[in-house]
UniProtKB/Swiss-Prot annotation:
GO-annotated biological processes: arginyl-tRNA aminoacylation; glycyl-tRNA aminoacylation
Pfam family, one: DALR_1
Catalytic function, reaction form: tRNA(Gly) + glycine + ATP = glycyl-tRNA(Gly) + AMP + diphosphate
Record has Lipid biosynthesis as a keyword: no
Gene: glyS
Recorded family membership: Belongs to the class-II aminoacyl-tRNA synthetase family.
EC number: 6.1.1.14
Organism the protein comes from: Acinetobacter baylyi (strain ATCC 33305 / BD413 / ADP1)
Record's GO cellular component terms: cytosol
InterPro entries: DALR_anticod-bd (IPR008909), Gly-tRNA-synth_bsu (IPR015944), Gly-tRNA-synth_heterodimer (IPR006194)
Protein name in UniProt: Glycine--tRNA ligase beta subunit
Location(s), subcellular: Cytoplasm
Organism lineage string: Bacteria, Pseudomonadati, Pseudomonadota, Gammaproteobacteria, Moraxellales
């Protein structure tokens, strides 16, 4: 069968930059699906995307479908022929319906019945016939939220379509896609090479466009931007901040990237750098530069879509554009300083946190009381914790946060520093929202840890207290994410406290607002404990490890974490699988018949294997007990791993359910002692082999 290289390009007006990569990937995925559904094999497929085009190159694709046979079933052979072997009316009707003669009739076995059939040869359709509809269907299935229709077209797309290229090697495939006749003509850069570019072969696409100042390959264009940006940053001994989403967006905005470094006035560096970075990244799509200490430098890098003969004009134009935005940030910052943070509480008293739970000032006072109560646990200074809590939400009323909501907390830190607050208090204002996402950093200060914990606990307990716990996909207060934050704050700061203690402390701040304290306590504790699984699955911990620990229901997150780590370590030991299986066996035996009260009677140990196991238990128990007391669970389980050989020997050579009642009772007690030792850390019988 012949193989071909196919090129498809859809040219249009500038595509939405934030969607370009998604559209490219979806076009490739949908086309692959269409080719597979049609039975057209291919070696590889590459997708391209630039501001004015989406394209595909399909390598070594079949020139046609394989020929097939289609079976049309008729009556049973018994009903198709009479006693003399002549066709019955049933068979004649079948042949007439299929337009065939008797010599074209075949038979096949359908279970226990033999039937007649007609095997019709079906010639496979050509690539030329199939591909246009495959591509049109792929375009129709793209994830486009809002489609538009141009005046001259009956079809809809995310942007008006201008041209279509569809080549099979050096031949145009006759097709109409998106109401445009396919051809072999594409177009280069809108300004550098606006004239038509005729493609002689599908393989010429990338090279022909690069000659016309278009880099169609998204990844190549992106790599070029990264190289240029790094070079410009290196020239001023700085490092560029290159967020992945911003890099994708900038790559989607240009066909021929040319990075240029510009300056802004150094006086703006007095403004919180987070505000400057935010406005330059979000509004201007610039890459900001920082020094080795992470301090913003008075430069930015813009990526132009043209190679100018006078780049100075572009640089000066961007400097002129960014100045008003930086001036706005400076104005907000200076205006905010005219009003001390503490004086903003009156505005907080008019900002609703949640209708039933009061205002943001109500929340602040609850957090302050809770922070003081948490201070002995976190090691924070109670006075610092209380002050930080009362100031924590004040920057929400500031001009700077009003313009840049993502600066909440950060703005407060700057203002607190200016007002002379100590480091614990000022840093806590910015740290209160940490961690913001999975894997994010935690607060560095004890006061920040305290406020972050108090804020989350107050919200969680309050929302549960008014009966608005998360249900299904509804979690308007992001309590699931917040719960994992609480667990991380406790575990990673090694806070020795139970979830129940923390929830109880938070409940005290609500008084009569929460009507059923007992139910709220139980529900909130269960919710937090239920988030262990999400937390540890993110870390790659196996489900059976969690189940082994959860079987003991540890109350302290820190203790829970130590047990998980210990079981994870134990699970990797060569003895683990055999010990888990043995413990399952022990658990099953004791479930059927509980061990009698009392200790093992050494005189009733008659078999060598049971004597050896008892001796090992007597030796290992005093070695393990101090480790358990110190919560060194990893070392404890490692010690217990040495019991594998005597346990295996016991089950190989000893009948637990002996006819002699005393021997049986003694062996059950021995197993109970063993079971107890292995379930102090976790129920290892839950572990899978």
């Amino acid at each position: 069968m012949s193989k071909h290289t196919v090129l498809f390009e859809l040219g249009c007006e500038e595509l939405p930059p934030k969607s370009l990569k998604t559209l490219r990937d979806a076009l490739q995925a949908e086309t692959v699906k269409g080719l597979k559904d049609a039975g057209l094999a291919f070696a590889s497929i590459e997708a391209y995307a630039a501001p004015r085009r989406l394209a595909l190159k399909i390598v070594d694709v079949d020139g046609a479908q394989a020929d097939t046979q289609k079976r049309f079933d008729g009556p049973a052979v018994q009903a198709a022929y009479d006693a003399e072997g002549k066709p019955t009316k049933a068979l004649e009707g079948f042949m007439r319906g299929q337009g065939i003669t008797a010599d074209q009739v075949s038979t096949f076995q359908a279970g226990k019945v033999e039937k007649v059939c007609y095997l019709k040869d079906v010639k496979g359709q050509t690539l030329d016939a199939l591909l246009p509809q495959i591509l049109q269907t792929a375009l129709d299935n793209l994830p486009i939220a809002k489609r538009m229709r141009s005046a001259a077209s009956r079809t809809e797309f995310v942007r008006p379509v201008k041209w279509v290229v569809l080549l099979k090697d050096d031949q145009i495939i006759e097709a109409t896609i998106q109401d445009h006749q396919a051809g072999n003509v594409t177009y280069g850069h809108r300004f550098h090479a606006p004239e038509a570019v005729t493609l002689a072969h599908a393989n010429d696409y990338l090279a022909a466009l690069e000659k016309a100042y278009v880099v169609a390959n998204f990844e190549k264009r992106q790599a070029t931007i990264q190289e240029q940006v790094k070079k410009l940053a290196d020239e001023v001994n700085a490092t560029a901040i290159v967020p992945a989403d911003l890099l994708d967006e900038v790559t989607s905005l240009v066909e021929w990237p040319v990075a240029l470094r510009a300056n802004f006035e150094e006086r703006f560096l007095a403004v919180p750098q987070e505000a400057l970075i935010t406005t330059m990244q979000d509004n201007q799509k610039y890459f900001c530069l920082i020094n080795s200490e992470g301090k913003l430098q008075p430069y930015f890098i813009t990526v132009s879509n043209i190679e100018s003969k006078d780049p100075t004009q572009i640089i000066e134009g961007n400097e002129k554009v960014v100045r008003p935005r930086l001036s706005d940030a400076e104005f907000f910052f200076l205006q905010d300083q005219k009003q001390p943070l503490a004086s903003r509480k009156e505005k907080l008293a008019n900002m609703v946190f949640q209708a039933q739970l009061g205002t943001l000032w109500d929340k602040s006072t609850r957090i302050a009381k809770l922070a003081v109560a948490l201070s002995p646990i976190t090691g924070a200074n109670p006075a610092d914790a209380e002050k930080a809590a009362l100031l924590a939400k004040c920057d929400l009323t500031s001009e700077l946060v009003g313009e840049f909501p993502e600066l909440q907390g950060i703005a407060g830190t700057y203002y607190a520093r200016i007002e002379g607050e100590n480091t614990e208090v000022s840093e806590a204002l910015g740290e209160q929202y940490l961690p913001k996402f999975a894997g994010d950093v935690l607060p560095k200060t004890k006061t920040g840890t305290t406020i972050a914990l108090a804020d989350r606990l107050d919200t969680l307990v309050g929302i549960f207290g008014i009966g608005q716990a998360p249900t299904g996909s509804k979690d308007p207060f992001a309590l699931r994410r917040s719960a994992i934050g609480i667990l991380r704050l406790i575990i990673e700061n090694e806070l020795d406290v139970t979830i129940e203690e923390l929830v109880n402390l938070a409940l005290q701040g609500y008084g009569d607002i929460v009507k059923d304290h007992d139910k709220t306590l139980a529900d909130a504790v269960a919710f937090l404990e239920g988030r262990y699984r999400a937390k540890y699955e993110d870390q790659g911990v196996a489900v059976d490890v969690l189940q082994a620990v959860q079987a003991l229901a540890p109350k302290s997150p820190l203790d829970f974490d130590k047990r998980v780590n210990a079981v994870n370590h134990f699970r990797a030991l060569p003895e683990a699988a055999a010990l888990a299986a043995a413990n399952k066996r022990v658990a099953n035996i004791l479930a059927k018949e509980a061990a009698p009260e009392g200790s093992v009677v050494e005189a009733n140990l008659v078999e060598d294997a049971e004597k050896a196991l008892f001796a090992e238990l007597q030796a290992v128990t005093p070695a393990v007990e101090p480790l358990l007391a110190a919560k060194d669970y990893t070392a404890a389980l490692s010690k217990l791993a040495a019991l594998r050989a005597p346990i295996d020997a016991f089950f190989d050579g000893v009948m637990v359910m002996a006819d002699d009642a005393d021997l049986k009772a003694n062996r059950l007690r021995l197993l109970a002692q063993l079971r107890h030792l292995f379930t102090v850390v976790a129920d290892v019988s839950v572990l899978q082999g």
